[in-house]
Amino acid sequence: MGVELKNNLKQAWWKAMVWQRDDVEGLDASLLTSPNVLKYSGHEDTFTDPLSDCKDCKSRWREDQLTDGICPNCGSKNLTEARPFNLMFKTSIGPVDDGSSYAYLRPETAQQIFTNFKNVLDSTNRAVPFGVAQMGKSFRNEITPGKFIFRVREFEQMELEFFCKPDADEEWFKYWVQSRIDWWLEQGIKKENLEVFEAPQDDLSHYSKATTDLSLIHI
């Protein structure tokens, strides 16, 4: 039943985002990502979580899991200083695993949308504004997976990147936030169960100008 529910949701999303629009193209790109892409996007340096080790029980924790510097496993305060831990899975390319030729499993579906932007532009003769949508697997090497489905190492994303002129970005951002709210309500979620959260400026990703999260707070 779970897989059918997921497939129905994916199909409904694709229908609304691609089939029923004339300004969005669909994409199905590779899971493997060139390190150059993630280097220049900033992910190699900044796609990290702060990590601390407990010197007594040898467990590892994200910094946001620690309260008052106490290990949740054994109660020790003998913790290492937090250090950045990169969340991307690295894999070797070719027959020799000597570290010289490698790629990453994509941490998001966005990167291939950006790297294929020119291909989509040339093959469809489009002009901005237009969007590119993609669904598929993404991978993150979580330090401590858990929290139901919210901290897992393999997961599925449904993503749209919408390209517009710089002076129209705020207008389109507001449009898409409201569009996503309306779509989720159409799927049967009650308005009082949908929380809209605007991230503060100091909590934005390194590539983000603004972020609005929609969260299901009750079922």
Task: Mark where each language-model region is.
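TRNA-recognition modules of translation machinery and tRNA-sensing kinases, especially anticodon-binding
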Residues: M1-I217
